[in-house]
Protein backbone atom coordinates (compact mmCIF):
# COMPACT_ATOMS: atom_id res chain seq x y z
CA UNK A 1 0.00 0.00 0.00
CA UNK A 2 1.57 3.30 -1.06
CA UNK A 3 1.07 6.80 0.25
CA UNK A 4 2.19 10.09 -1.28
CA UNK A 5 4.46 12.38 0.74
CA UNK A 6 1.66 14.97 0.77
CA UNK A 7 -0.82 12.42 2.17
CA UNK A 8 1.70 11.39 4.82
CA UNK A 9 2.21 15.00 5.87
CA UNK A 10 -1.55 15.55 6.07
CA UNK A 11 -1.87 12.49 8.34
CA UNK A 12 0.79 13.91 10.65
CA UNK A 13 -0.89 17.33 10.77
CA UNK A 14 -4.22 15.65 11.62
CA UNK A 15 -2.51 13.43 14.25
CA UNK A 16 -3.48 10.26 12.40
CA UNK A 17 -1.26 7.19 12.07
CA UNK A 18 0.62 6.21 8.93
CA UNK A 19 -0.09 2.48 8.61
CA UNK A 20 2.64 -0.18 8.46
CA UNK A 21 2.71 -0.82 4.69
CA UNK A 22 2.39 2.90 3.98
CA UNK A 23 5.30 3.65 6.30
CA UNK A 24 7.42 0.99 4.58
CA UNK A 25 6.78 2.66 1.22
CA UNK A 26 7.39 6.18 2.58
CA UNK A 27 10.58 5.23 4.40
CA UNK A 28 12.01 3.49 1.31
CA UNK A 29 11.43 6.70 -0.66
CA UNK A 30 13.14 8.80 2.02
CA UNK A 31 16.13 6.42 2.26
CA UNK A 32 16.57 6.42 -1.53
CA UNK A 33 16.40 10.21 -1.79
CA UNK A 34 13.19 10.07 -3.82
CA UNK A 35 11.44 12.68 -1.65
CA UNK A 36 12.62 16.29 -1.76
CA UNK A 37 14.58 17.51 1.28
CA UNK A 38 11.83 20.05 2.07
CA UNK A 39 9.10 17.40 2.06
CA UNK A 40 11.24 14.86 3.96
CA UNK A 41 11.99 17.47 6.66
CA UNK A 42 8.29 18.36 6.89
CA UNK A 43 7.30 14.69 7.32
CA UNK A 44 10.02 14.06 9.93
CA UNK A 45 8.86 17.14 11.84
CA UNK A 46 5.21 16.09 11.55
CA UNK A 47 5.95 12.62 12.89
CA UNK A 48 7.83 14.12 15.85
CA UNK A 49 5.04 16.59 16.68
CA UNK A 50 2.25 14.00 16.52
CA UNK A 51 4.54 11.44 18.28
CA UNK A 52 5.69 8.39 16.36
CA UNK A 53 3.68 5.22 17.04
CA UNK A 54 5.01 1.73 17.70
CA UNK A 55 3.80 0.68 14.23
CA UNK A 56 5.49 3.60 12.46
CA UNK A 57 8.79 3.07 14.29
CA UNK A 58 8.70 -0.71 13.63
CA UNK A 59 8.12 -0.19 9.90
CA UNK A 60 10.85 2.47 9.64
CA UNK A 61 13.32 0.20 11.48
CA UNK A 62 12.44 -2.66 9.14
CA UNK A 63 13.34 -0.51 6.12
CA UNK A 64 16.62 0.67 7.67
CA UNK A 65 17.51 -2.98 8.27
CA UNK A 66 16.70 -3.75 4.61
CA UNK A 67 19.14 -1.09 3.43
CA UNK A 68 21.93 -2.00 5.88
CA UNK A 69 25.21 -3.76 5.11
CA UNK A 70 24.77 -6.83 7.32
CA UNK A 71 27.28 -8.66 9.50
CA UNK A 72 27.07 -12.46 9.57
CA UNK A 73 27.61 -14.16 12.94
CA UNK A 74 27.33 -17.97 13.03
CA UNK A 75 27.17 -18.63 16.78
CA UNK A 76 24.33 -16.45 18.08
CA UNK A 77 24.11 -17.78 21.64
CA UNK A 78 24.51 -15.08 24.33
CA UNK A 79 24.67 -12.50 21.53
CA UNK A 80 23.72 -8.96 22.61
CA UNK A 81 23.88 -5.29 21.61
CA UNK A 82 24.54 -2.61 24.26
CA UNK A 83 23.40 0.73 22.93
CA UNK A 84 21.85 4.08 23.82
CA UNK A 85 19.77 6.48 21.80
CA UNK A 86 22.01 9.32 22.92
CA UNK A 87 20.51 12.76 23.25
CA UNK A 88 20.16 12.61 27.04
CA UNK A 89 22.43 15.64 27.48
CA UNK A 90 24.29 14.07 30.40
CA UNK A 91 27.81 14.37 28.88
CA UNK A 92 29.00 11.27 30.75
CA UNK A 93 31.87 9.00 29.75
CA UNK A 94 31.05 6.06 27.47
CA UNK A 95 29.40 3.74 29.96
CA UNK A 96 27.88 1.35 27.43
CA UNK A 97 31.22 1.05 25.59
CA UNK A 98 33.06 0.22 28.83
CA UNK A 99 30.29 -2.25 29.71
CA UNK A 100 30.81 -4.00 26.37
CA UNK A 101 34.33 -5.11 27.33
CA UNK A 102 33.23 -6.31 30.76
CA UNK A 103 30.25 -8.25 29.40
CA UNK A 104 32.40 -9.86 26.69
CA UNK A 105 35.02 -10.85 29.28
CA UNK A 106 32.22 -12.50 31.30
CA UNK A 107 30.96 -14.62 28.40
CA UNK A 108 28.60 -12.52 26.27
CA UNK A 109 29.09 -11.95 22.56
CA UNK A 110 28.69 -8.26 21.68
CA UNK A 111 27.76 -6.60 18.40
CA UNK A 112 27.86 -2.90 19.25
CA UNK A 113 26.39 -0.48 16.77
CA UNK A 114 27.54 3.09 17.29
CA UNK A 115 28.48 6.47 15.92
CA UNK A 116 30.20 9.69 16.86
CA UNK A 117 28.94 11.81 19.77
CA UNK A 118 25.29 12.78 20.20
CA UNK A 119 24.48 13.05 23.92
CA UNK A 120 28.05 12.87 25.14
CA UNK A 121 31.03 14.95 24.13
CA UNK A 122 32.32 11.60 22.94
CA UNK A 123 30.33 8.91 21.11
CA UNK A 124 31.33 5.24 21.17
CA UNK A 125 33.25 5.67 17.90
CA UNK A 126 35.22 8.61 19.33
CA UNK A 127 36.35 6.83 22.48
CA UNK A 128 37.16 3.57 20.67
CA UNK A 129 39.43 5.51 18.29
CA UNK A 130 41.09 7.16 21.30
CA UNK A 131 41.72 3.66 22.70
CA UNK A 132 43.44 2.63 19.45
CA UNK A 133 40.58 0.68 17.88
CA UNK A 134 40.32 0.64 14.09
CA UNK A 135 36.62 1.41 13.59
CA UNK A 136 36.71 1.44 9.77
CA UNK A 137 36.08 -2.27 9.25
CA UNK A 138 34.05 -3.96 6.54
CA UNK A 139 31.06 -6.10 7.59
CA UNK A 140 33.17 -9.22 6.93
CA UNK A 141 35.99 -7.94 9.16
CA UNK A 142 33.53 -7.11 11.95
CA UNK A 143 32.27 -10.70 11.74
CA UNK A 144 35.86 -11.96 12.05
CA UNK A 145 36.43 -9.76 15.11
CA UNK A 146 33.32 -11.22 16.78
CA UNK A 147 34.57 -14.76 16.05
CA UNK A 148 38.05 -13.95 17.43
CA UNK A 149 37.25 -11.77 20.45
CA UNK A 150 33.51 -11.91 21.12
CA UNK A 151 33.21 -8.20 20.23
CA UNK A 152 32.37 -6.38 17.03
CA UNK A 153 31.93 -2.64 16.57
CA UNK A 154 29.81 -1.51 13.64
CA UNK A 155 30.40 2.13 12.74
CA UNK A 156 26.96 3.31 11.64
CA UNK A 157 27.96 5.22 8.46
CA UNK A 158 29.75 2.12 7.11
CA UNK A 159 26.76 -0.12 7.69
CA UNK A 160 23.97 2.29 6.74
CA UNK A 161 25.17 3.88 3.46
CA UNK A 162 21.61 4.93 2.51
CA UNK A 163 21.66 7.35 5.44
CA UNK A 164 23.76 9.65 3.24
CA UNK A 165 20.45 10.76 1.68
CA UNK A 166 19.07 11.72 5.09
CA UNK A 167 22.17 13.02 6.91
CA UNK A 168 22.18 16.56 5.40
CA UNK A 169 18.45 16.96 6.17
CA UNK A 170 18.92 15.87 9.80
CA UNK A 171 21.95 18.11 10.20
CA UNK A 172 20.16 21.20 8.88
CA UNK A 173 17.02 20.49 10.96
CA UNK A 174 19.07 20.22 14.14
CA UNK A 175 16.23 18.64 16.16
CA UNK A 176 15.42 15.09 17.19
CA UNK A 177 13.55 13.02 14.61
CA UNK A 178 12.49 9.39 14.29
CA UNK A 179 16.08 8.62 13.21
CA UNK A 180 17.33 9.32 16.76
CA UNK A 181 15.33 6.34 17.98
CA UNK A 182 15.93 4.12 14.93
CA UNK A 183 19.71 3.76 15.38
CA UNK A 184 19.52 1.32 18.33
CA UNK A 185 16.80 -0.70 16.53
CA UNK A 186 18.83 -1.35 13.40
CA UNK A 187 21.83 -3.44 14.49
CA UNK A 188 23.45 -4.74 11.27
CA UNK A 189 24.34 -8.03 12.97
CA UNK A 190 20.69 -8.55 13.99
CA UNK A 191 21.63 -9.27 17.61
CA UNK A 192 18.61 -11.10 19.10
CA UNK A 193 19.17 -9.60 22.57
CA UNK A 194 19.67 -5.98 23.54
CA UNK A 195 20.27 -3.58 26.42
CA UNK A 196 19.04 -0.21 25.15
CA UNK A 197 19.15 3.13 26.94
CA UNK A 198 16.66 5.83 25.91
CA UNK A 199 16.52 9.61 26.40
CA UNK A 200 12.86 9.91 27.46
CA UNK A 201 10.69 7.87 29.88
CA UNK A 202 7.90 7.44 27.29
CA UNK A 203 10.33 5.58 25.02
CA UNK A 204 10.80 2.72 27.50
CA UNK A 205 7.42 1.17 26.77
CA UNK A 206 7.52 2.13 23.10
CA UNK A 207 10.97 0.78 22.24
CA UNK A 208 10.53 -2.52 24.06
CA UNK A 209 7.30 -3.14 22.12
CA UNK A 210 9.01 -2.19 18.87
CA UNK A 211 11.70 -4.77 19.67
CA UNK A 212 8.92 -7.29 20.29
CA UNK A 213 7.48 -6.59 16.81
CA UNK A 214 10.93 -6.84 15.25
CA UNK A 215 11.40 -10.34 16.69
CA UNK A 216 13.87 -9.73 19.54
CA UNK A 217 14.31 -12.53 22.08
CA UNK A 218 15.41 -10.74 25.25
CA UNK A 219 15.27 -6.93 25.23
CA UNK A 220 15.84 -4.61 28.17
CA UNK A 221 15.11 -0.91 27.62
CA UNK A 222 16.15 1.52 30.37
CA UNK A 223 15.79 5.17 31.35
CA UNK A 224 17.47 6.56 34.47
CA UNK A 225 15.07 8.92 36.22
CA UNK A 226 17.91 11.44 36.56
CA UNK A 227 17.80 11.67 32.76
CA UNK A 228 20.47 9.11 31.83
CA UNK A 229 20.10 6.72 28.89
CA UNK A 230 21.76 4.03 31.05
CA UNK A 231 20.98 2.06 34.18
CA UNK A 232 21.63 4.82 36.72
CA UNK A 233 23.36 4.91 40.09
CA UNK A 234 21.95 8.36 40.84
CA UNK A 235 18.22 7.55 40.71
CA UNK A 236 15.70 4.80 40.06
CA UNK A 237 15.73 3.33 36.55
CA UNK A 238 12.61 2.60 34.52
CA UNK A 239 12.83 -0.78 32.78
CA UNK A 240 10.87 -2.32 29.94
CA UNK A 241 11.74 -6.00 29.53
CA UNK A 242 10.77 -8.39 26.74
CA UNK A 243 11.36 -12.01 27.70
CA UNK A 244 9.68 -15.19 26.45
CA UNK A 245 7.44 -13.06 24.25
CA UNK A 246 6.01 -11.08 27.19
CA UNK A 247 6.62 -7.41 28.04
CA UNK A 248 6.97 -6.26 31.65
CA UNK A 249 7.60 -2.73 32.92
CA UNK A 250 9.10 -2.02 36.34
CA UNK A 251 11.56 0.14 38.31
CA UNK A 252 14.90 -0.83 39.75
CA UNK A 253 17.04 1.00 42.34
CA UNK A 254 20.78 0.76 43.06
CA UNK A 255 19.94 -0.44 46.58
CA UNK A 256 18.18 -3.50 45.08
CA UNK A 257 21.65 -4.80 44.21
CA UNK A 258 23.52 -3.69 47.31
CA UNK A 259 24.83 -0.54 45.60
CA UNK A 260 24.81 2.95 47.08
CA UNK A 261 22.90 5.70 45.31
CA UNK A 262 25.65 8.03 44.04
CA UNK A 263 25.26 11.21 41.97
CA UNK A 264 26.33 10.84 38.36
CA UNK A 265 28.06 14.25 38.44
CA UNK A 266 31.45 12.58 38.78
CA UNK A 267 30.94 10.77 35.46
CA UNK A 268 30.95 13.89 33.25
CA UNK A 269 33.70 14.33 30.66
CA UNK A 270 34.74 17.10 28.27
CA UNK A 271 36.00 14.97 25.37
CA UNK A 272 37.03 11.51 24.11
CA UNK A 273 40.39 11.64 25.93
CA UNK A 274 38.73 12.17 29.33
CA UNK A 275 36.19 9.48 28.47
CA UNK A 276 39.00 7.06 27.62
CA UNK A 277 40.72 7.77 30.97
CA UNK A 278 37.52 7.13 32.94
CA UNK A 279 36.79 3.96 30.94
CA UNK A 280 40.29 2.63 31.67
CA UNK A 281 39.84 3.41 35.39
CA UNK A 282 36.66 1.34 35.45
CA UNK A 283 38.22 -1.60 33.57
CA UNK A 284 41.36 -1.45 35.75
CA UNK A 285 39.35 -1.99 38.96
CA UNK A 286 40.02 1.49 40.35
CA UNK A 287 37.43 2.01 43.14
CA UNK A 288 34.90 4.73 42.34
CA UNK A 289 31.69 5.64 40.57
CA UNK A 290 32.90 4.71 37.04
CA UNK A 291 33.64 1.13 38.12
CA UNK A 292 30.30 0.86 39.96
CA UNK A 293 28.15 2.12 37.09
CA UNK A 294 29.98 -0.08 34.57
CA UNK A 295 29.44 -3.13 36.81
CA UNK A 296 25.74 -2.27 37.01
CA UNK A 297 25.30 -1.80 33.26
CA UNK A 298 27.51 -4.72 32.24
CA UNK A 299 25.59 -6.88 34.72
CA UNK A 300 22.30 -5.85 33.13
CA UNK A 301 23.76 -6.62 29.69
CA UNK A 302 24.82 -10.08 30.88
CA UNK A 303 21.23 -10.68 31.99
CA UNK A 304 19.95 -9.45 28.59
CA UNK A 305 22.42 -11.82 26.88
CA UNK A 306 21.13 -14.73 29.00
CA UNK A 307 24.61 -15.32 30.44
CA UNK A 308 23.31 -14.32 33.89
CA UNK A 309 20.08 -15.50 35.50
CA UNK A 310 19.30 -12.02 36.90
CA UNK A 311 20.74 -8.50 37.02
CA UNK A 312 22.18 -9.29 40.46
CA UNK A 313 23.93 -12.40 39.09
CA UNK A 314 25.15 -10.30 36.16
CA UNK A 315 26.67 -7.67 38.47
CA UNK A 316 28.54 -10.40 40.36
CA UNK A 317 29.95 -11.77 37.08
CA UNK A 318 30.84 -8.26 35.90
CA UNK A 319 32.74 -7.53 39.12
CA UNK A 320 34.69 -10.78 38.73
CA UNK A 321 35.60 -9.91 35.12
CA UNK A 322 36.93 -6.52 36.24
CA UNK A 323 38.74 -7.74 39.38
CA UNK A 324 40.47 -10.61 37.54
CA UNK A 325 41.84 -8.31 34.83
CA UNK A 326 39.82 -10.14 32.16
CA UNK A 327 37.89 -7.00 31.16
CA UNK A 328 41.06 -4.95 30.59
CA UNK A 329 42.62 -7.85 28.67
CA UNK A 330 39.48 -8.07 26.51
CA UNK A 331 39.95 -4.42 25.53
CA UNK A 332 43.59 -5.03 24.55
CA UNK A 333 42.61 -8.15 22.60
CA UNK A 334 39.94 -6.22 20.71
CA UNK A 335 42.34 -3.38 19.82
CA UNK A 336 44.83 -5.93 18.42
CA UNK A 337 42.10 -7.73 16.45
CA UNK A 338 40.91 -4.53 14.75
CA UNK A 339 44.45 -3.35 13.99
CA UNK A 340 45.19 -6.52 11.98
CA UNK A 341 42.94 -5.13 9.22
CA UNK A 342 44.87 -1.85 8.76
From Swiss-Prot:
Pathway: Amino-acid biosynthesis; L-tryptophan biosynthesis; L-tryptophan from chorismate: step 2/5. Its cofactor is Mg(2+). Anthranilate 1 binds at residues 84, 115. It comes from Cupriavidus metallidurans (strain ATCC 43123 / DSM 2839 / NBRC 102507 / CH34) (Ralstonia metallidurans). Belongs to the anthranilate phosphoribosyltransferase family. It holds the Pfam family Glycos_trans_3N. Keywords: Amino-acid biosynthesis, Aromatic amino acid biosynthesis, Glycosyltransferase, Magnesium, Metal-binding, Transferase, Tryptophan biosynthesis. Anthranilate 2 binds at residue 170. 5-phospho-alpha-D-ribose 1-diphosphate binds at residues 84, 87-88, 92, 94-97, 112-120, 124. GO terms for molecular function: anthranilate phosphoribosyltransferase activity; magnesium ion binding. Catalyzes the transfer of the phosphoribosyl group of 5-phosphorylribose-1-pyrophosphate (PRPP) to anthranilate to yield N-(5'-phosphoribosyl)-anthranilate (PRA). One of its GO terms (biological process) is L-tryptophan biosynthetic process. Binds 2 magnesium ions per monomer. Homodimer. PANTHER family: ANTHRANILATE PHOSPHORIBOSYLTRANSFERASE. Mg(2+) 2 binds at residues 229-230. Its EC number is 2.4.2.18. It comes from the Bacteria. GO terms for cellular component: cytosol. InterPro entries: Anthranilate_Pribosyl_Tfrase, Glycosyl_Trfase_fam3, Glycosyl_Trfase_fam3_N_dom, Glycosyl_Trfase_fam3_N_dom_sf, Nuc_phospho_transferase. Mg(2+) 1 binds at residues 96, 230. It catalyses: N-(5-phospho-beta-D-ribosyl)anthranilate + diphosphate = 5-phospho-alpha-D-ribose 1-diphosphate + anthranilate. This is Anthranilate phosphoribosyltransferase.
